[in-house]
Regions:
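A structural signal for short, hydrophobic/glycine-enriched beta-strand patches
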Residues: 1-136
Length: 136
């Protein structure tokens, strides 16, 4: 849990809203509200990505936003999630991305804790798949 805000940080929340048919609720939007209202994180430090359908596209789409906003590709980013999901990201997600997306949009960095790991954006994330109708 964040105990303070560092003004050099940006928070990305990536979660698709339409995995529930007819739902108007979006986890990324709700998490943004929580960060602003409960943790006093400035709104301009929060970037949401509501299009990803699963972890492969979560990371790919976040890397695209990192590029779009001119953030450096040589600086580590941090994923924060459950322990099991974090282990999957660092151990098997690259192979899954290659299989499902035909590219790996990140390079693993250091494991920081059971629930946190570094990654570095990869330029391959910028490839658009013309056969994928939901590829933003």
């Amino acid at each position: 849990m964040c105990t303070g805000y560092n003004f050099n940080w940006y928070w990305f929340y990536s979660k698709w809203s339409t995995d529930r048919t007819g739902s108007t609720w979006c986890e990324a939007v709700e998490m943004k509200k929580f960060l602003i209202e409960k943790l006093n994180i400035p709104e301009n430090a929060i970037i949401i990505e509501p299009h990803a359908r699963h972890t492969t596209t979560n990371l790919r789409n976040c890397v695209r936003l990192i590029y779009r906003y001119g953030m450096p590709f040589n600086k580590a980013c941090i994923t924060t999630t459950s322990g099991g999901q974090s282990m999957m990201i660092t151990n098997t997600l690259a192979a899954r991305c290659l299989k499902e997306l035909n590219e790996v949009p990140f390079q693993n960095g250091k494991r920081l804790s059971e629930t946190e790991a570094e990654f570095y954006p990869a330029i391959d994330a910028l490839h658009i798949n013309p056969t994928e109708p939901l590829d933003p």
